[in-house]
Amino acid sequence: LTRRKIKNLPNNINELIIDFNSSLKEVSFPECDHLCVCMGTTIKNAGSREGFKKVDLDYCIDIAQRAQKIGVSQISIISSIGADDQSRNFYLRIKGMLIKKILTMGFDTVNIYLPGLLIGKRNEKRFLENIGQKIAPIIDRLLVGKMKKYRSIKADSIAAHMIRSKTKGVNYFYYEDIMNEK
C-alpha cells in the first residue's frame, strides 16, 4: 500500500496506491504474507501533532489490523532510533507507541527497523533534513563503536533489507544489521 507510485519495484511486489485520507475500509487488500509499513510524515506536513499521530500511528495500526485479518503473518516497520512509548519527545513517543502496539498484535514475525536519519529523495522540501543529509557523511565517520547505530542510512537500503529478510520472530534492525547483511 502506498500513497504514491514507487519506481522500479521487483515483479513479485504488488503495489496498491490508496488515498489514506479516505476510508481504509473501502480498500480491498490484496492477499500477501508480508506487510512493509514505511509510512511517515512530519508535524509540519501533517499540520499538527494530531495529524502527525494520525499518519505515523493510527494509519499504520489500521493497516496492520486489516492485513492481519487477511492472513498476513509477517510485518516490517520503519521506526526511529530512540523510539520509546514513554519518551518526552513527541516524535519518539509516537514511534514507540507504534512498536508497542505492533508487538501485541500476534504476528509470527515482526521486523522493526530503527534508523538514524533517513537519506533519500523527498517530494517535499524539508529544510533541516536537507541540511542533515548534506552533513551526515561527515558526522557518520565520527559515529563508531556503539554509536554506529545512529548513522544515517539510505531509505533504499532499508527497503531492500525488508524485502530480502528471512528472519522469524521479533527482530530489531539497526544501521550495522542492515548494512552488513550478506
Regions found by a protein language model. Give the residues of each.
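Structured catalytic cores of enzymes that bind and process phosphorylated ligands/cofactors
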Residues: 8, 16, 32, 62-65, ...
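Short aromatic-enriched loop/helix-cap "lid" or pocket-rim segments at secondary-structure transitions
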Residues: 10-13, 27, 123-127
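Conserved Rossmann-fold NAD(P)-dependent oxidoreductase catalytic core, especially the SDR/UDP-sugar
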Residues: 49, 54-97, 104, 108-111
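Active-site donor-binding loop signature of nucleotide-sugar glycosyltransferases
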Residues: 3, 18-20, 115
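Short, polar loop motifs at secondary-structure junctions
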Residues: 1-8
